[in-house]
Amino acid sequence: MSEPLLRVVNLEKKFPIQRGLLKRTVGQIHAVDGISFDIAAGETLGLVGESGCGKSTTARLILRLLDPTAGEIYFNGKEIHTLSREEIRKERKDMQIVFQDPYASLNPRMTVRQIVAEPLIVHGLAKDDSDPAVDEMIELCGLSREFGNRYPHEFSGGQRQRVGIARALVTRPKLVVLDEPVSALDVSVQAQILNLLDDLREKFGFSYLIVAHDLSVVSHISARVAVMYLGKIVEIGTREEIFENPQHPYTKALISAVPLANPKQERVRKTSRIVLTGDVPSPANPPSGCRFRTRCWKAQDVCATSEPQLLTIGKSQVACHFPEK
């Protein structure tokens, strides 16, 4: 089996809690706590979970926008957090990101052509925004090259996100992190953007890590899905296995909340929808044992004393003492 493009091993990130004038450390926030996964070349992995589960922190660690507390991240066979500033600069052209907010992520004083050309210029791949690769990528992302001299405020949200996608893909990176790429867009535009991303992946062989809280978004383009809860991956598997045969109670609850397009099916399913009670525990003081046990209808004594490990069940890996049968 070939080496994966990205391999994450026992990754941890803890943020200190500091108080007082002397900034005394009184605790830690366990944002990411010992997660492992990999992404193959040309593959899309969806990372899903509720707000505060650590998925966006994971994305920032992978891009080396944050330094990990522990663990390793291998990209292109290199452990990125051991690379020098110059070495990581060379790798960055192969690691790009599409941001959540198409309004805030674009410089209002730059034209579309300048925005898309910027990564090429920074990495020494072009001298200015007249490079043919700029107009080519603008058109590949569904915009006319005539838009190149316009400014971001002249476009709709969906068009701005297309500009952001063109900027991220113009260097032909190997890995693209999609941080909630459609959550700020109208529902009518979301499918268009997701289809565009999938078409470009097939054309150029990009690998995607898509971070989202909406499972319907992840199911649209992901080959595999990892479900996070309170800093831990509780289940990871193929898209079909996760959505058709979820093993972890939390995964099952998330999927039961995804609305169906057919009104009749939606009315029938409402009777079996799983409603989680209680709030998500604080990452500064996570529960002992299984972190989901405080909201789980299957929890027993062993769940409080023993932390479940990821075990292979069928085509999935699940961390649960009492997985679905």
Which residues does each predicted region cover?
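Helix-to-loop junction immediately C-terminal to a conserved catalytic motif
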Residues: 63
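P-loop NTP-binding/switch modules centered on Walker-like glycine-rich loops
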Residues: 177, 181, 185, 189-267
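A short, proline-enriched helix->beta-strand linker immediately N-terminal to the Walker B motif
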Residues: 170-174
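Conserved ABC transporter NBD signature motif
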Residues: 71-79, 91
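Short catalytic/signature loops enriched in Gly
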Residues: 2-4, 18-23, 238-325
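Conserved ABC ATPase signature
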Residues: 151-155, 159
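Conserved ABC ATPase "signature" region
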Residues: 79, 121, 129-146, 255-256
